Amino acid sequence: MKLGYGEFSWPTGEAYHGQFYRDHFHGLGTYTWPDGSSFTGTFYLSQREGYGTMHTKTMLFQGLYKEDQRFGPGIETYPDGSQDVGLWFREYLLKLCTRVPSGFSLVNYPEFLAFLTKSRRRLDLSDEKVELGLSEEQDPFFYDYKQYLLNDELKLPPEMHVYSTDNSHLPMTDSLRQELDDHIFMNEIPPFIEDEEPWLITNETPLLVKIQKQTYKFRNKDAHTSWNIPAILEGNRSRFGPSGPKEQISKKMIMKAEEGDYNWIFGILRDNLACADVADSKGYTVLAAAAMHSHLDIVNLLLDFGADVNKRSDEGITPLSMCFLQYYPCKSFHPNIAERTLLQESPKSLVTPKISFLLADANIDYLYDVGMPIAGGDELKTSSLDDSLASMQTPESSNMLHKEEVSPVKTVSTDVEKESEGAAENVDASTLYSVDTNFESTKCLRNYTINVSRDIMEKSAQAYSSLPQHPCFPYKGTVRKMAQSMVERRNRWMTITLLLRRGADPNLCQVPMQALFLAVKAGDVEGVRLLLMSGAQTDIQFPPQLQSLTPLHIAVSLPGEEGVKITELLLHVITNVDAKAADEDYVYKGGKADLLPSSLKLNNEPGPPKSFYSTHTFIPEEGGRTALHVACEREDNKKCARDIVRLLLSHRANPNVLWSGHSPLSLAIASGNDLVVKELLSQGADPNLPLTKGLGTALCVVCDLVYEQQRSVENKIALIDRLISYGADVLNPVTLVQGDRTAVGTAVDYGYFKFFQDRKIAHCPFHALMPAEREVFMARKRLLEYLGLQLRLAVLSKESRLDTKALYLSKRAELAPCHRLKKKGSSSVRTQSSEKQSIPFYKFCYQCGRSIGVRLSPCPRCYGILTCSKYCKTKAWIEFHKKDCNDIMAMIPHLEGSAWRVAESP
C-alpha cells in the first residue's frame, strides 16, 4: 500500500510525485503527461480536487477543481497576456466577471421593492445525513434491515481498501470521508469548523451553490488569496489582464442573443466555443437574454444544447419570471381590497394635429381592462402599452396636451362641448385649419375633433399586427403603435408557453413573487390556467410584512368576471380554502364615531333572562382574513362578489369565523351587499354568531353609524326582516362597554348606544339641525323604532308561551311591591305561593325597546308593560296598550281569586 510522499510512473510516460494515502494520490502533488502538460496542486482519491495549476503548451490555468474537473473560480492565461477570468465548469466559463449593460435587474422595477423582504440564505456546511430510528409510521418504505445500510461498519466488507481502490463505484462511509478530509487539511483550519459565519449564497442555482460550497471548503489555502480569488467571486475584474477569447465570445453571445442572431450563436455552440449556460457577473444568462427579447428560435437552440431553463440570476430570478414581469407590468394589476391598493388617477388625453383621436392614453387603459383577441386564439390582456406609446408624439404635437382628464371608460364620449374646457388653459392648442397660430386667447376658437371609436382602432391594429412584416415609417400613429405592442405581447406569451413546455418551474422563483401572483393580480384567466396546468402551487403566500396573502385572497377581490373565473380555477386546485392572512390586528373601518363616547349611561343592567334566548355552545375562531372575508368586504361589483361567495361556500369555506371582530355575514352587511347577505344566510351562516371588539351581532351592525351610508332605511328594514326570517334573535344579549362601566342589553340598546355617540344629531333641537341632518335624524329614529318593534314582538312571543296568570302575578309582585291582596289570610302563605309562581321576565321599554340607560316605570293600572318616558308611555297607550290594559284590568279579579284559592290549598 502506497502511503506518504513518493513518486510513481507509468510506461505511457505519465508520472506523479507527491503525497499518497491508501494507494491513492491524496494531498499535494504534481502529475505530468508525455506531451509536457502538468498539474500541480491538491489531489483527492487520485483526482484533482481543490486549487491547482494546469500547464499546457498553449495556456496556463489556475483555479479550483473537483472530481478531476474545473469547478469554481479560475484564471486561464494565454501567451499574449490575455486572461479568461470567472467561474468555470469543466472546460467552459460559467459566469463572467463583467456585466452586460442591458442585463435584467429588479432595480428597474421599484414597484416590487416592498416584496424583497427575504434575506439571502447562508451556505449549509453540514453534509446531509440520514437519521436513524425512523419508525414504520414515519417511513413509508420501512423494512427491518434498512437500518443496516445506515451503519458505517456494515456498508463495506472489512478491509475493503486492501483489495479494491475503486471508490467511484463504492459507497463512501462518513468515517472514511472524515479521515480523508483530515489528511488534506492536516495543517490548516478544518474546512467546516464554524470559526466564522458561513458565506451568504450569491446565487441559488444548485450548481452555483455547489461551486460556492467547494470554494468555501478551500478558502484557507494560500492560492485562494494569492490568485485573487475573492475578486473573482465579487465580480471585480480590474486586477486581471485583458479579456481572453472565451470571455469575449461568452459576453458577445449574450449580446447576440438579445439581437436575435441565431446563426452566430449556433456556430459558437456547434464548435463548443462557449457554454450555453454562461452568464454575466449578475447571473444574466444567454437564455434570459433570448427570452427577454422573445427570440423563440434561440431559446429552443440553447435548451437543445443543454442550457438550464431554471437557472437563476444573482437576484434569484429565472428566465420565466423575467418574462412574466415583462408580460405583467405594474400598470396591469387591478386595484383590490385584499392588498388595500388605491385606484390610480385617470390618464390625460393627447391632442394630435388637425385630427384629435380622443383614444390616446385612454385606449391604453382600455386594454388593461378588457381582453383583446389576437391571432392564434390567445387574448391580449393587461397590456403594457404606455411605454410603447410614449414616443408617439411628433415634435409638432409635443406641446399640445389637453389639461382635462379622460377617465378610462369602456366607450368614448362624443360630446364635443367638453373639448372647450381644456382649450382655455392651452394657448397653443391647434385648431382644425391652423397649426401655427399663436393668439393670446383661444376662447373664440373651436377644435372640431374626429372621435374614432375604440372598436375601429382595435380592429385596425389587430389586422395590422397580423401582417408578416410591418413597413417602417418615420412617424407611427396610434394604430401602428397598438399593432406593434400586440405583436410584442403575443411573442412574450409564446415565449412563456415555450419555457413552460421545456420544463421551466413556475414555483422556483419567489422574487419578487411567484408567477401565479402576477397572473392573478393582473386578472389574466388564461395565464392562471396555464400556470395551474404547469404545476403552479396555490399554497403560497406573500411575506408576513405584506399580510401573508394567498392567490385566493387576491382572486376573490378582483373586479369583474375575471375574478369569478380565476377563483373557480384556484378552488379546483387549492387545499385550504380558509387560509388566513396575517392581518388579525387590522381594524376594519375604524371610523370617528367609534372613538366618541356615548352619552348613554351604563348601569350594569343584566340584560334579558336566559330563558328568553338560546346560548351559543362554541366560541368562534378568530384570526386573519380568509378569502370569504375578503369577498364579503367588497363594495365594487355586488353580483360578482355574490358569485365568488357562492363558489367559496360550495367548496366548504367556513362562514362562521371572525376577523377584526367581524364574521363574513357582518362584513357583507357593512359593505352594503345584500346579494352576499342572502347567499350567506341561505348557505348556513349563523346570524346569531357573537361578534367581538364591541360589534355585538349581525343585527347590531345594521344599525351601526359607521356603515349607515351603505343602504337606505327601507333596505335596512328589509335586511332586518331577512335576518329575523333566517333565525336572527333580537333578544340575544349584547355587552356594551364604556370606560369601566358595562351593561348587557340587546341590539336595540346597541343601536341607541351608537345613536348617542353622534351628540349633535342626538341632542340638538330638531329645528336647529340642517336639512340634511334632519333627514339623518329621522332615518336613524325610524330604524331604531322598527328594531324596537321587532324586540317587543319577540318578547311577546316568548311571553305567550308562558303561563299568563303566573306571568302577570310575577310582574305585579315585582313591579308593585307595596301591593297587597284585599282578602284576609296568612301573609307567609301568600309569599311562599308567590315565590313558587315567580317567573323571570325582561324589563325593557315596550315602546322604544331600550333597557339600558333609562328609568323604567310600569303602567300604573295593569303593571303589564314598562316605559322609559312620558313620550313612550303616551305613544304606547295610543298604539297598542290601551286595549291590552283594559283586557288585563278585566282579568284582574279572576286572576286574584285564582291566586287566593291557590294560597288556601293545603
Swiss-Prot record:
Disulfide bond as UniProt keyword: no
Binding site for Zn(2+) 1: C845, C848, C868, C872
Record carries keyword Metal-binding: yes
Pfam families given in the database record: Ank_2, Ank_4, MORN, zf-MYND
Zinc finger annotations (MYND-type) as residue ranges: 845-885
The protein, known as: Ankyrin repeat and MYND domain-containing protein 1
Ranges: MORN repeats: 16-38, 39-59, 61-83
Residues holding Zn(2+) 2: C859, C862, H881, C885
Top-rank taxon, per record: Eukaryota
An example molecular function term from Gene Ontology annotations: zinc ion binding
Residue ranges of ANK repeats: 282-311, 479-508, 511-540, 547-579, 623-657, 660-689, 701-732
Signal sequence bounds: none
Compositionally biased residues, Polar residues: 391-400
Annotated disulfide bonds: none
Keywords, ordered alphabetically: ANK repeat, Metal-binding, Repeat, Zinc, Zinc-finger
Region (Disordered): 391-411
Gene that this polypeptide is encoded by: Ankmy1
UniProt organism field: Mus musculus (Mouse)
